[in-house]
């Protein structure tokens, strides 16, 4: 990735808005992405000259052009203005011609997170962080705020099912983001509200150790604006350790701590207490009580149209954020009842030969365990079959025992080769180490062949879950659409049809 002038732990080099000239140009590489397109509109609304490029003719480019933003298809060095601040994502590498040109010209290069923080300093920025649960929790917050008329802006990693998008520019004061810890970019934000769903060591290829990973979350809490709110999950061991490490609040301007969960609350100012959970296929409800300084301020029932106790817990985090924003909790909790989920979170993609086919983004053992519980409820009297694509060699290596434990709960397991993403292979590490550790299941290296193997093992009434953060999603959709992958060419065509 191109060198970024500011480090991820120090924003001193990113100017305040009044210090950036009103005629400043910004150039966004990858402008068509959901999050980048919203950022482009934000910069444009602030009066800056905005242009950018994307490798493909994305649907968002038409909206950007209609707003008066210059957009190019394809990355070429001559398109980069010589006076621009260039904005990149972690997906932009040094061999990108526009990034290389910006570096050669000595232009400022900002990460998307830095630019988004710059644009949202006048908003109530709500940042949701955690090893898992970020997308669902941030989606719940954005969805409910929209339903009650707060007109929020948001930039989320997944697509909110009812809205068909994961990014939106609204006129309200709230801006909801999913803060990514995988590359440290969440340390670039200055939130008014931080929601931390859990702290379970992950992305050790970047952080190096569990201790460094946990320290990053301590550093994240230090990014909170004066007078802001920390919304912390009391049911997570890592968050409990964090709460002990965050300095005591003293004096005016210190952060408010809002604890949420089913168990014993953390010491803090506000407690969102969940109790009496009842779960069923595709639904769940529980009691909610909110106390501020020991005085009850709200009591009601939370009902969700999605299953799993982990989703009720995520909704508790959303309620904590809503309370921090001063939102009417009765309206907000009613709006949560209309939330139908985020894409790739136990998403029903179709039914074929009386086999229900679901898709889920789960890639860490803890979140997979929660997903499998919800999937088991949905399976009813049918069997639960899983086709899993491990994500990252390092995660697979470090968590092989945990993967084996959680997958012992399924009736039939197929594992394909690792989705490498940003990593180089680790000798001796692939999907087969999971089935070998488990002592059952089938390893099929090619993901299309693995998907077809899993489908052929299913019987009418079964539930087949495609699981993983990589490209396995294409397989589930394609099989649901009737593809059988008789050849590599057909597999490629099936994938193209889902793009």
Model-predicted segments: where are they?
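N-terminal leader/targeting and accessory segments in enzymes
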Residues: 1-115, 237, 307, 493, ...
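Phosphate-binding loop of NTP-binding sites
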Residues: 17, 42-45, 65, 79-81, ...
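Nucleotide phosphate-binding/pyrophosphate-handling subdomain across enzymes
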Residues: 19-27, 35, 39-46, 187, ...
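Short acidic low-complexity segments
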Residues: 70-82, 165, 446-454
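Glycine-centered, small-residue-biased loops immediately flanking beta-strands
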Residues: 228, 382, 462
